[in-house]
Regions:
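Gly/Ser/Thr-rich active-site cleft segment
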Residues: 93-176
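Short alpha-helix plus adjacent loop in nuclease-associated cores
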Residues: 70, 74-89
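N-terminal glycine/serine-rich phosphate-binding loop of ATP-dependent small-molecule kinases
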Residues: 1-68, 79, 95, 122-124, ...
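Short beta-strand-loop/turn "lid" adjacent to the catalytic site in phosphate-handling enzymes
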Residues: 15, 39-73, 97-104, 130, ...
Length: 176
């Protein structure tokens, strides 16, 4: 049997010209839920994290989130697919990643951020949304494979990041 102990909203907000996820609010909701479990005398054996794909956050060298992640619903990727296809064909990208082209995919968000010159100079790590939660819970920087597969930056055959895609698009491989 399952019992819902806590529920909280997750709504993007407009900040600095972009729709952003409020990570602090999300983590507060998570913390409240975990406290309710603990206060209820339940034994916690493990915790699973399940979120949507494609969105990411950038962390600095001290492993702190630089700014709230931009939501996949933001319009910053308008026209980016066509720009990327001038650098790497849709067929070649599919051959490498096995993922369909959608403007909300992480690859297009990263190119849009770079093209808009909004890449923070202090960015040292990139974490997908569930990995931000993992980092909050345990302090580790981990890129979980199934979430990485939503980025259109991972090889479908090796299950590793595809450095040739990063190089072709001028994206910083070292933050992965």
């Amino acid at each position: 049997d399952f019992e819902e102990l806590h529920r909280f909203s997750n709504n993007p907000r407009l900040h600095d010209g972009h729709e952003r996820w409020n990570v602090g609010e999300l983590l507060d909701g998570l913390t409240t839920g975990l406290a309710k479990i603990s206060n209820g005398g339940r034994d916690v054996i493990s915790i699973g994290v399940d979120t949507w794909g494609v969105d990411y956050g950038l962390l600095d060298g001290r492993k702190r989130l630089i700014e709230d992640p931009i939501c996949y619903r933001d319009n910053r990727t308008d026209g980016i697919v066509e720009h990327v296809q001038q650098l790497i064909s849709r067929d070649e990208l599919f051959r490498i990643t096995g993922l369909q082209t959608l403007p909300l995919n992480t690859i297009y968000q990263l190119v849009a951020q770079r093209e808009a010159r909004e890449w923070p100079p202090s960015a040292a790590h990139l974490l997908m949304m569930p990995d931000i939660v993992h980092h909050y819970l345990c302090g580790e920087l981990v890129g979980e494979h199934t979430m990485a597969s939503t980025t259109q930056l991972a090889s479908a055959t090796t299950r590793e990041w595809a450095p040739e895609v990063f190089e072709c698009l001028g994206l910083p491989f070292e933050v992965m």
